[in-house]
Each structure stands twice: as C-alpha cells, then as structure tokens.
C-alpha cells in the first residue's frame, strides 16, 4: 500500500506551492524551457522540464537564488476556473500542458493557479501567499531524467527534486538524515562490501549475488525454511514457466499482462515465465481430492518470479525484474480461518524481531466498489483480520475500499533504523482464484465446498529484504548474519602455530573465521581494513596470548576485550550466533 499524502496538510500545500515557484525561476533563467508537471511528494517536491540546454548541479544554486527573490515578493496563489478552450489557448506554447488538457472532458472543471509572473494548470491546493514559506527552509537536491508520462517511448525530460520544511532546523535535520541514507545506500555498500552486482549488458534488474552476499542470503533462507517447518508449513518447489492456459485461467493475461514478460513459443504452445506462484500451488492442490480432515494446507515456497519493470523504476535489489518471493498459501475451511490468520500475523512479528525490526505499522484494506466473492465471506474475513490485529495489540489504520477486488488484506510495514517505512508482509484473502480453478474439498456433511485461500508473504522478496537489511545495519550485520564473523590477526610469524590452532577450533564449531597472516601489512592497518569491511570480531594473537592460551578481541566498533580463555572466546561468539543477537 503506497503512503497517501494529506492534501490539506499545510506542509503539503507549501511543497506544492514552492514547486510553482521553482518552475517560474527556471523559466526566468532559461526562457525557452517547456514545463511539464510538478507535484509535492513525500519529503519534498519536483518539477519536470524540457530544457533547450543541458543543466548541471551547479545550476541548482542559481535556481535557488532566483526562487528566494520570487518568495520575497510575498505574492498570492490565486485559483481560476477556465474552459477547455481557454486552457488550450493559454498554454498553446506548452506542448506538455496541451497533452494533459486534451485528456480532459469538456465538462471537467479546469483550474489554473496564478502566482507572481507564473501561471500553471493545476488542481491545487496551495497556500494563500508566498510569505508563509521560510526562504531558508528549502533546498534543491538533485537532477534526474524522467520520461514524459513515465513512458519510455516518450521524450526524456529533466526532473529537478527539492525539499521544503517548515523551518531551517527541520531542513538541516532532513539533510543530515539524507546524508546518512546515502552513506547506507545498499548499492554503494553492495560494491564496497562485494555483496552483489547488476550487469546491464546481461539484463537490467537481475541480481548477481557474490560469495559474501550469497552467504547472507543463504542464512536468511535457511532460517526461513527452519521456522516454516516449525510452524507446520510444507515447502514446495514449482517451475519458472507455464503455458498460456494457466495465466488465462488465473486472469493474469487479462489483468496483469503489462507486468509480464513476453511469451515464448515452444512445441506449438505459448509459455510465460511466472509473475506469481499462486497458480502453481493451486495446480498441486488440484492433483487430488481433499477432505475437510486434510485441511489446512500451509504451503510455502521461495519462488523466483519475473515481472517487467520499466528501466527507470529499477533500484538495486529493491526494485528488480527477477526476485524470490517468500510466498505461502493457506488453504483452509471457514472454521479454520480465524486461527490461521492470527498465526500468520504472529509468525510475521516473530520473524521481523529476529532480524532486528520491532517497530511497525499496519493497514487494513476493505472491500472496494467492484469485487468478487460472497458478501458474507467479505464481512467475515474483514472481521477476522481486525480481530487478529486487536488480539496481538497491533495499532492499525483502515483503508476503506482499498482492498483488492478479490479480497481484503492486511499490509504490514516495518520501520528501519533511519525511521523509514518498508512494506513487508501481506495477508490477503482470495475469493477469485479458488473459483477460477474450481478448487473444492469434501465438507463434513459430504458436500463439495470451495476452500478459503489466504496469500501470505512475510519478508516480501528475498532480494528486497536483503537490501533493506544492508541499509538498516549500514552493512554491519548481526554476528549470525555476518558473512565473515571473525578474523585472526597474528602480530608476527612466531605465533602462527597458535593462530592456526584457534582457526581450527573455531572452524570445527561452525564459526565463519579466517586467518590473515599477510606479513606485508601492519597490524593496525589490518584492523582498520576489517573494521571497514564490517567484520564483527578481530582476534589479536600475540606472544602473551600464546603463553597464556588466551585471546584478545577487537570489535568493529573499536571495543577491546582482553584476556579471554580460548573456550570463553568460543562460547562468546557461539552465544551471539545461537541467540541471533542483534547488537
């Protein structure tokens, strides 16, 4: 569920208004520029321009200066309603505005906003006048390319992003947070820590996990599987492709085709790589007959799916074209629904906690205007979702009418160490696919009934969750997730025999450890190197440690733990791993 912006919020109006101020400043500085659209967004605003000349980051300072000059006038924002004919005449030299106007119906209200020397096609809302904007509380922050209307077939425009806050203090706090976000960017850390790569020449949006990143991914997936078995799930494996009839039956080719890869023709049949796992799980269900005594089925899969995303929308491991969903489908009876939903919710909270996420937000989306399924089933399922949230003490917001046409859902968002929300788990009823695929079971009264089906993801996708973890921890993973947990650094060659003994002892206990006996680098340089690589522990081995049979530990945060017995050091690390300690 995307976050909705409150159009009546004063800050929203300010950001909308300053986008107009920026557009006016740009036109004054670059007179032949054509304007497109400029909305407020979370934390700021942007405007898309068609420049005659290429602009650079240095130009942003000139634009900011001109914006402050315009703000000093204190001009009002005045709304006027005009006809479509008047709008076409007013914006006759603005091709992007004309494009928008042509889409409007003759009966539609067309509004413009005038401010200082600028007029824009706009629905609003805006603040009354520019005097309400603190000229020290905004900053233009970046330039990017953006296709007109988001369509790669259209011209690439120049998008200028800015941020605006109520005062200078809030602006500085945001800019500081922004710098920390840049420092933790999973794409940057992915290169620095050698975790993953993307190869445009092979295919955009396709992730290559390197040994260290693959180790972390394997640890996530192993834990996922272990916990699913503990919670009564069976693990499935299904193909990556399926014939077109499957996607016709599921409705994907009717409603989801734009997000699917093109068909492949083989053996006189059309195949598609799967955008979702659900139809495959249903195919397994439909291979046999089922009684109410067999239910519930809890079927989970780390299933790789493929979805066509526009190149401009791709973002590291967060937005990709091929990704692995931690997918599950619960197939159950009416009487089992309440328990199953509550258990899924409890399971989600448990999993997040183990990865270090304790803060969350929940959203319950209810029946939309157009829907499928029995009215009583909708009422019951919404009630069950509400009760599950209440029983587990989870505060939630209701998105009335925001559910999918095939069923209500709970969306759960985690809040990371930088205060950002990330969509993670979804618990979604489906009244559509069971009917489309004619799923049935024999009820207690001997009649054939349609089972309830609940779609469920806990981590969302492994690739995206991986990127979130990288940024949440800034690459300094908890010991249990660290690809390399310990490095032994001997102070000289004399102690190497003892260092090898430590290495062997820890390896036998499953600790991910290595010995750095490179004589060409000083010890302090090695410590700095491994701290920059976010290795949790460095074991410093000198002659004193050899004589006493002990270990001195330096942590990646530069803490020192001296004089631990070898057995104590081993237990110290093992405890951090077995308890999945976060700090």
From Swiss-Prot:
GO terms for molecular function: ATP binding; metal ion binding; threonine-tRNA ligase activity; tRNA binding. It comes from Borrelia turicatae (strain 91E135). This is Threonine--tRNA ligase. It is found in: Cytoplasm. GO terms for cellular component: cytoplasm. SMART domains: tRNA_SAD. It is an enzyme of class 6 (ligase). Its EC number is 6.1.1.3. Keywords: Aminoacyl-tRNA synthetase, ATP-binding, Cytoplasm, Ligase, Metal-binding, Nucleotide-binding, Protein biosynthesis, RNA-binding, tRNA-binding, Zinc. The gene is thrS. Binds 1 zinc ion per subunit.
């Amino acid at each position: 569920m995307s976050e909705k912006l409150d159009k009546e919020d004063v800050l929203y109006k300010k950001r909308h208004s300053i986008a107009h101020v920026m557009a006016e400043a740009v036109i004054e500085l670059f007179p032949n520029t054509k304007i497109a659209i400029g909305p407020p967004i979370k934390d700021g605003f942007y405007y898309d321009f068609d420049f005659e000349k290429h602009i650079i980051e240095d130009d942003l300072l000139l634009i900011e200066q001109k914006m402050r000059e315009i703000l000093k006038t204190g001009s009002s924002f005045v709304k006027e309603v005009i006809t479509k004919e008047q709008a076409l005449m007013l914006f006759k030299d603005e091709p992007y505005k004309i494009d928008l106007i042509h889409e409007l119906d003759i009966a539609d209200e067309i509004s413009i906003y005038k401010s200082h020397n600028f007029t824009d096609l706009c629905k609003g809302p805006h603040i009354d006048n520019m005097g309400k904007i603190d000229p020290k509380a905004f900053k233009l922050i970046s330039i990017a390319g953006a296709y007109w209307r988001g369509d790669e077939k259209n011209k690439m425009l120049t998008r200028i992003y800015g941020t605006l806050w109520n005062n200078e203090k809030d602006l500085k706090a945001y800019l500081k947070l922004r710098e920390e976000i840049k420092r933790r960017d999973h794409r940057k850390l992915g290169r620095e820590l050698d975790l993953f790569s993307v190869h445009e020449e092979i295919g955009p949006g396709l992730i290559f996990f390197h040994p260290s990143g693959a180790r972390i991914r394997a640890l996530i997936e192993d834990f996922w599987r272990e916990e699913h078995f503990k919670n009564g799930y069976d693990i499935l494996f299904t193909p990556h492709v399926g014939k077109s009839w499957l996607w016709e039956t599921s409705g994907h080719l009717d409603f989801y085709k734009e997000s699917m890869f093109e068909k492949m023709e083989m053996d006189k049949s059309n195949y598609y790589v799967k955008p979702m796992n659900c139809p495959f799980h249903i195919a397994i269900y439909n291979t046999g007959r089922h009684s109410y005594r067999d239910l519930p089925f809890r079927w989970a899969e780390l299933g790789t799916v493929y979805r066509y995303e526009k190149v401009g929308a791709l973002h590291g491991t967060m937005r990709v074209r091929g990704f692995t969903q931690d997918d599950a489908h619960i197939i159950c009876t009416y009487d089992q629904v309440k328990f199953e939903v509550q258990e899924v919710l409890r399971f989600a909270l448990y999993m997040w906690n183990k990865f270090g996420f304790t803060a969350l937000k929940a959203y319950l989306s209810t029946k939309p205007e157009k829907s499928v399924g029995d009215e009583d089933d909708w009422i019951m399922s919404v009630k069950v979702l509400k009760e599950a949230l209440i029983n587990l003490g989870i505060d939630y917001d209701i998105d009335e009418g925001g559910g999918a046409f095939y069923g209500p859902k709970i969306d759960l968002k985690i809040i990371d160490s930088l205060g950002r929300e990330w969509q993670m788990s979804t618990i979604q009823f489906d009244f559509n696919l069971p009917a489309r695929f004619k799923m049935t079971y024999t009820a207690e009264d001997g009649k054939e009934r349609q089972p309830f089906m609940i779609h469920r993801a806990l981590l969302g996708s492994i690739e995206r969750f991986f990127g979130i973890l990288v940024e949440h921890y800034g690459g300094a993973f908890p010991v249990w997730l660290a690809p390399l947990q310990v490095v032994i650094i001997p102070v000289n060659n004399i102690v190497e025999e003892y260092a090898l003994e430590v290495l062997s002892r820890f390896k036998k206990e499953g600790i991910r450890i290595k010995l750095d006996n490179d004589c060409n680098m000083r010890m302090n340089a090695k410590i700095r190197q491994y701290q920059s690589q976010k290795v949790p522990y460095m074991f410093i081995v000198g002659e004193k440690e050899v004589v006493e049979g002990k270990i001195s530990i330096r942590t990646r945060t530069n803490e020192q733990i001296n004089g631990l017995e070898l057995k104590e050091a081993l237990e110290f690390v093992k405890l951090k791993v077995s308890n999945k300690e976060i700090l």
